[in-house]
Amino acid sequence: MLVLLNKPYGVLSQFSDRSQPPKRTLAEFGLPPDVYAAGRLDHDSEGLLVLTDDGALAHRLTDPRHKQPKTYWVQVEGAPQAEHLQALRDGVALNDGPTRPAQVRMLDPAPQLWPRDPPVRVRKTVPDAWLELQITEGRNRQVRRMTAAVGLPTLRLVRVAIGDWRLDALAPGQWRAEATTNARPSRSRR
């Protein structure tokens, strides 16, 4: 079984939490039994999360050797210049080593998304912009660290695709089951 969920902001990518006070988890969304997240989204990130009961599929989605593309819409603080975008395309030096090259483009106009609760802070004197960033790794907070490393801190991060699976019109907290015949990730073009 394969389930696509639009994980809301402020929800952990797991079904339980033992911290005090407990945080919101996937348990509140009425997901089918026996599925688990194939990969993660940070507590403060939103968007597409794939859940499955198929261990081999989960491995193909999460093992970096498979170079599964993951696409994000990223609201950044600042006005990206050509050199910022090129640095992301070339790969960024992080404290745990260089990233693989990424695909990146400006999103103009900004994507029409659901409101976030709490809203992203607005600073009238500081510009912001939206990028579409596609990576083939899945390091901890990788997109946020990449944009910060080139001088563009992330304000909002929404995953919109994993391979050929897209978020489409799923509202936050909504999910849909996909036929298992569709449960094949795309092949990376890199």
UniProtKB/Swiss-Prot annotation:
Gene Ontology MF terms in the entry: 23S rRNA pseudouridine(2457) synthase activity; RNA binding
Which Pfam family name is an example for this entry? PseudoU_synth_2
Give the matching InterPro entries.
PsdUridine_s_RsuA/RluB/E/F_cat, PsdUridine_synth_cat_dom_sf, PsdUridine_synth_RsuA/RluA, PsdUridine_synth_RsuA/RluB/E/F, PsdUridine_synth_RsuA/RluB_CS, RsuA_PseudoU_synthase, TruA/RsuA/RluB/E/F_N
Catalytic activity reads: uridine(2457) in 23S rRNA = pseudouridine(2457) in 23S rRNA
E.C. code:
5.4.99.20
What's an example Gene Ontology biological process for this entry? rRNA processing
- Keyword Isomerase on entry: yes
Which residues does the Swiss-Prot or TrEMBL record annotate as the active site?
A: 42
Going by the entry's taxonomy, the superkingdom of the source organism is recorded as Bacteria
Q: Which UniProt keywords apply?
A: Isomerase, rRNA processing
What NCBIfam families does the record point to? pseudouridine synthase
Family, per the entry?
Belongs to the pseudouridine synthase RsuA family.
Relate the protein's function as given in its record.
Responsible for synthesis of pseudouridine from uracil-2457 in 23S ribosomal RNA.
In its UniProt entry, what is this protein called? Ribosomal large subunit pseudouridine synthase E
The organism is Xanthomonas axonopodis pv. citri (strain 306)
Q: Which gene encodes it?
A: rluE
